[in-house]
């Protein structure tokens, strides 16, 4: 299973680790993914998704249905 957010599509970022002597080596910055069961009010059921903590924070603010609508996601297929 790839480390990708089910709702936002966030994935790993390629970055550099810089030492004290400024030697740069490649580093993979993974997304902070969490496995969560979210209640979908319109569908009257739980949805099991793998989401980033940033997405969870946005869902708490806006709501699951409005976030999915803004991202163009059909929750009945998740």
UniProtKB/Swiss-Prot annotation:
Similarity remark: Belongs to the bacterial ribosomal protein bL28 family.
Keywords: Ribonucleoprotein, Ribosomal protein
HAMAP family found in the cross-reference section: Ribosomal_bL28
Organism per entry: Prochlorococcus marinus (strain MIT 9211)
InterPro entries: Ribosomal_bL28 (IPR026569), Ribosomal_bL28/bL31-like_sf (IPR034704), Ribosomal_bL28_bact-type (IPR001383), Ribosomal_bL28_sf (IPR037147)
Protein name: Large ribosomal subunit protein bL28
GO terms, biological process: translation
Domain of life: Bacteria
PANTHER family noted in UniProt: 39S RIBOSOMAL PROTEIN L28, MITOCHONDRIAL, LARGE RIBOSOMAL SUBUNIT PROTEIN BL28M
GO cellular component, one term: ribosome
A family per Pfam: Ribosomal_L28
Alphabetized GO MF terms: structural constituent of ribosome
């Amino acid at each position: 299973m790839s480390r990708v957010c089910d709702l936002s599509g966030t994935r790993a970022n390629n970055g550099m680790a810089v030492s004290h002597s400024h030697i740069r080596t490649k580093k993979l910055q993974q997304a902070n993914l969490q496995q969560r069961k979210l209640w979908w009010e319109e569908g009257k059921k739980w949805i099991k998704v793998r989401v980033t903590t940033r997405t969870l924070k946005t869902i708490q603010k806006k709501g699951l249905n409005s976030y999915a609508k803004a991202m163009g996601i059909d929750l009945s297929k998740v």
